[in-house]
């Protein structure tokens, strides 16, 4: 079984502050953000709602995608989220299926 890597987007609320990250354990990483265990941007701006994620088999591809998304215009990021999550639902509770 190959290792999985995830690029994820957290939001403070619908159309709110966005944070993009990469991890090899999405459940643990989002939980850390939600519990305030990671000092910095997400804790400071209360960004803890998982609104989008993508899965990769190759860590280099995941990191490349994260860097590309971080350079995107805000409008493009919002459109990406809304393509798969129109209501901006928190996807964290659905993570037990991955």
Where are the language model's segments positioned?
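An amphipathic, aromatic/His-enriched active-site/gating alpha helix that lines ligand/cofactor pockets
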Residues: 64-82
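GIY-YIG nuclease catalytic motif and its immediate N-terminal context
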Residues: 1-38, 43-53, 60-67, 84-86, ...
């Amino acid at each position: 079984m190959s290792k999985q890597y995830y690029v994820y987007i957290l939001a403070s609320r619908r159309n709110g502050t966005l944070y993009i990250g990469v991890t090899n354990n999405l459940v643990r990483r989002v939980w850390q953000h939600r519990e305030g265990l990671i000092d910095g941007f997400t804790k400071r701006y209360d960004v803890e709602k998982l609104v989008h994620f993508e899965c990769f088999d190759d860590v280099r591809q995941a990191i490349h995608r994260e860097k590309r998304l971080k350079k995107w215009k805000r409008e493009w990021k919002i459109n990406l989220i809304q393509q798969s999550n129109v209501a901006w639902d928190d996807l964290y509770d659905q993570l037990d299926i991955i």
